[in-house]
């Protein structure tokens, strides 16, 4: 049998002393499309059987927000054997006159609405903060100038194109919290059609908490459930 290592053919030899294991397929590598690193992946299968991988595009380095970071998506229609060119699903460029490196968006989570096949991505957008780490520099409040913003995008064509960002911060954030963001990875659709994403936040006492946010109207409005520490 044959495999590929660094895009070069390689022969797999089995000596009978161990189980044969499949070689992984590298979807994104450091340096691809000029990015220093790709981190924080999530993976879903759409109703059409398409695989969608979501991740941070970390252009300058592998460090966390605040930095020059966008949300990327890779798409496969052959069960992961090959992947289409990367799509940028969420970017804030030079919003507010600040450089791209002070408009990072990252740590995505992805969800397939199994009733409609609409795909949702949620991520945290940080504006300003002087390239300090968002975990310590996001402050209480509601505006982008003071606190990280919780943003959604959606796709209604099986992950080919993505909407403009939708800001749901006013729907779900307590103004006293320092930082509200999603739980990276993926969300779920419950049997009754409720859409659920994991979330995390730093409260007014700077204690990290965990919870979920949910939508019962196909993603039009979002709410937080009982929170847990």
Set out the residue ranges of the language-model regions.
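Asp-box/BNR beta-propeller blade signature and adjacent active/binding-site loops
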Residues: 5-229
